[in-house]
Amino acid sequence: MIDATPEPQKNGKIINWCHVDVGDEYNETDENGNKVPRGIICGAPNMAAGEKVVVTLPGAVLPGDFKIEPRKTYGHISNGMCASERELGLGDNHDGIILLRKYGFTPEEYEKLQPGDDAMHLLHLDQPLLEINITPDRGYAFSYRGVAREYHHSTGAVYTDPATALGKKAPVTQGLPEGAKSDIEVIVDDKNPIHGVVGCDRYYARAVRGFDPASHTPNWMRRRLIRAGMRSISLAVDVTNYVMLDLGQPMHAYDLDKIEGPIVVRRANEGEKLTTLDGKDHDLSVEDLLITDSPNGERGSRVLGIAGVMGGLYGEVTAETKNILLESAHFDQVSIARSARRHKIPSEASRRFERGVDDQLQPAAAQMAAELLVKYGNGEPSEHPTDYNTVCNRRPILFKASEVARVAGLDTDVNTISDILTDIGCTVAGGGNGEFSVTPPSWRPDLNEPCDLVEEVARLVGYDEIPVTVPPAPVEGRVGLTAEQLRKRQVADELAEYGMVETLSYPFVGDEDYKNFALDADATKKVSVEIANPLAGDRPFLRRDIIPTLAQTVQRNLRRGVE
């Protein structure tokens, strides 16, 4: 920034007429053919001569399809724009433009920055992104930790689980000396468990006191959050989100000074409401699992958030928060999935909880978050966290090595099978006569039956190793599709060419569908086929028209946030 001349306006605003050196390649050319700094209008309050800033030039297109062009404004031709974080999609900060001296560069690195340097490279916006399609059973892969594990399986690269070292550093919660007081009392009072499964079997809470509310998120962390599709909000919130991305454990940060213990995890009562962090009001269902606290001694009377989905406005971390309570919990997958869909909140946390989170990860995640808050926010972590833990040990699976050949057709020796199961984290015992007792790791809730273990062996040996067997063709009779099958396929292909999508839905309807389409339920039932053992008790009839079940599909997709 060569100079910045303040110019008061009639409306009371003060704008700066600036001359900015953007390097000889991008500077303007005067009438004598000399390169001169660009003239740019800027209203940012932190604009000052001598600053090194990020400039977007004419022709650039910013997020929101905002095109940068030379334009006359405030009596000058502004030939570019000095950019803020929000304008570049780097965060929500729009209080001023980006000043590179505050952007994480060392003094030596800052001194080397020259006009004309590529800001995309300086801000690490030019690095490639890896997009991974993760199947619903691979909840652990929704993290750097999980992806690194899969990379190890794929390439043989050395893998060290970061949660192991973090867990060893976490404070001991068992056998505390008499009189030692934990951070806050936690009670789980689930009177309406879904399918008999209590909604929360582990709740780990740890306080960090003396946090500096003026501390900023380090730029490396902000970059990683943004590149993962998340917004940078504040250090405390960013730390919990980063731990989730890194380890796979969703977390929540509360303002400890606003929380009154005990914390009670319970189901919602009829008629309760909640305003979530995004400012939306929600009518709560009796199936919703809630995090509540106890103001004035009234146990569980104030709702703090929908467990595993989104927190409420009360208790959130603000710019004045000095003491933080970290929540690191394990919730029932079905409870979280239903609440997220019911309230149309497909949050990053709910996506992980509904797929299954490691039930032994909570202390390690809280330890990592505490270390980051100490390093960048000067906080002091508590040594007496609360750990409500009723997690049951995993049931061993009796597994015969011969199942691999029987189910997958792979001729794999016993030692290889044992090595593969051990490598994915299982505890393998036995092996005599080809029989194992296999205990799956805590991060793999999808491994429950012998066939699940066969799938893992086949996946890591390689599906391409499965022998190909061509089914024998019939000796007599017609070969291939019938004329009717060919006609149906041709029609489907033709409609698909016009952009239409085929919908396959269950053909079951009931009273609710008749009511939605103003049909006479009694009359319709008389001419409908009733199923003796329906999949859903409220839809026991076969449809006579496809429209009601198409409507069911649309409704289901909308509930899941699909437009």
Regions found by a protein language model. Name each.
Residues 213-241, 255-256, 262-389, 501-563:
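TRNA-recognition modules of translation machinery and tRNA-sensing kinases, especially anticodon-binding
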Residues 60-95, 306, 313-368, 387-394, ...:
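Internal insertion modules embedded within essential enzymes
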Residues 2-8, 16, 155, 160-162, ...:
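Glycine/proline-enriched, intrinsically flexible loops and inter-domain linkers
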Residues 1-178, 207, 300, 325, ...:
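Phosphate-backbone binding interfaces of nucleic-acid-interacting proteins
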Residues 112-134, 180-227, 333-353, 397-398, ...:
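Residues forming anionic-ligand binding surfaces in small-molecule and nucleic-acid pockets
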Residues 151-191, 377-404, 410-411:
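Terminal amphipathic helices with adjacent charged low-complexity linkers/tails
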Residues 146, 397-560:
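Extended, well-folded interaction surfaces typified by the phenylalanyl-tRNA synthetase beta subunit core
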Residues 173-197, 201, 369, 388-397, ...:
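Self-splicing inteins and homing endonuclease
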